[in-house]
Amino acid sequence: MLCCFFLAAKTSLSGNVFKKEMYRLTVYHYTTSAQETVLNNYLKNALLPALHRYGYKNIGVFKLIANDTTVLKTMYVYLPLKNLQDHLAITDKLVKDSSYQKAGAAYNNAVYTNAAYTRMEVILLKAFSLAPQMKLPKLIAAKNERVYELRSYESATEKIFANKVYMFNEGGEIDLFKRLNFNAVFYAEVIAGSHMPNLMYMTSFENKTDREAHWKNFVDSPEWKKLSTLPEYQNNVSHIDIMLLQPMEYSDF
């Protein structure tokens, strides 16, 4: 009887500790300041309050750090999910939510010639085995000084991609990021997106200078010098995208 109790407790505990989160990353591409105003009002006053009412938390809203002359601008909404069903259920809830519909009227009812964005994409991700839960960054800088770095690593084939995921997990890359205090928010593989096979992860810094110092420590570390030269990990990344982001003042983190 006692043995069964401990077995059940162990099963329950392992389920809580090792259950992988899902993430939804919504990317808005737009060109004008008017679109940005509508997007911000929608996210701040309609979408995030609705998601909070539904019990979702730790929602991140970020704007791509770019030159003022950049034509195509980008905004990201990061949402942790328990499972894929959450992704499907949210839309159904929003359709029936009168408070959301009223607060987001300018966005939801925009005419086809005056949409709040040029294009929108949704990326679904599954957390890595050695980073199954997102972590809120421990930063003290004001939000307008922080830098969140979102990276996407693409691989040539699914098999090669699996090798890069292994390198992050069992290979020790995540451990190195932890040791060097990169304040990672998440590490995950993309399960639905336009650049597969690929993984994405987000790290965070107090400011740009702090980011540069952390990456110098990373590339100079003996662990990375050894890991990056191991023959089994060569050519496992075919393309890298680096997005430097600033959190909006209404972002949860």
What role is predicted for each listed range?
Residues 1-8:
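Bacterial N-terminal signal peptides
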Residues 12-101, 105-106, 110-224, 234-253:
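Short S/T/G/P-rich N-terminal loop/turn motif that feeds into the first structured element of a domain
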